[in-house]
């Protein structure tokens, strides 16, 4: 899997790792509409997905879902912490350790982009 840079007309995506709790009941626990200003929201996994004893099939599925991830895209970290860790690992592996995520600020009630470079000293 190769990391891709897209031309300027590319519309970024916000990869929501897991559906927001309560989505299945039609009552999401929190609203992520504010993340749309950073790109189209792409939901990767259903609300109740879990990492199990044999994570191989889930890792394969996540790699497939992230195959078009680019330097312009963002991760929106929601869901099972083990799955979040795997997603960040996959993205870091394909982007030479550089990726962006959205951080919710409770006081300002807005998302802030954070650029991660795991090799930065």
Regions found by a protein language model. Give the residues of each.
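Long, low-complexity, Lys/Arg-enriched
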Residues: 1-74, 86-121
